[in-house]
Amino acid sequence: MSNTQTKNVPELRFPGFEGEWEEKKLGNLTTKIGSGKTPKGGSENYTNKGIPFLRSQNIRNGKLNLNDLVYISKDIDDEMKNSRTYYGDVLLNITGASIGRTAINSIVETHANLNQHVCIIRLKKEYYYNFFGQYLLSRKGKRKIFLAQSGGSREGLNFKEIANLKIFTPTIFEEQQKIGQFFSKLDQQIELEEQKLELLQQQKKCYIQKIFSQELRFKDEEGNYYKGWNKKQLKDVLEFSNKRTINENEYPVLTSSRQGLILQSDYYKDRKTFA
């Protein structure tokens, strides 16, 4: 990547690409912008197998969270065929507190369906889906989504507002693809590191349980276990302190109490604290 001062050209860029990026409305780059609906009967129609049914909780930052995935029958899916989503669709939460969360549909083996809280953004073939998914995940993309929200509560996006989102994009498909794949590799690496972190956290939790129950004990350099633990009251291992944080001639410091905010000097006048 190299630096450039040219207008509408990114500061960092992969070598081999030239020319300015163009600002385009998202609606001009897509073949579909639309959402789904909840089946008649709601959750009573959810099953443990069938067609994956995506809800807002399945849309995370850049990827699908399938831990809480539900399914619908083929018959219901046929009734809702207009809200089917396919591999490579950009999915965007458009209502509620999770508005703006974005993911790429990564379900390869079949299509999925979705409810009315999630919007399908399906790019034309000449535009690389993950470039635009990553753009919506960026700070600039999130800000545009926030500013586009409708209503006094600012917790809703309609299709017109989504279609009118203006995005700077490379004119060459290969550059879009290069950028999208670059971020995909970073996301994969992050996911691996998160899995490692989760394993370490589970390991720590297990060690804490075993060590503090003395099920697991350490040995000294000679291979002998350290002496047994002693049971003490907390006050026996703490040091009393009457120190205050300010001098009398400095600005007063308030502290919270059951009576509300009072001077720290009054609160600790006849009290002891632990250090």
Predicted regions and their residues:
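A short beta-sheet element
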Residues: 39, 49, 55-56, 67-139, ...
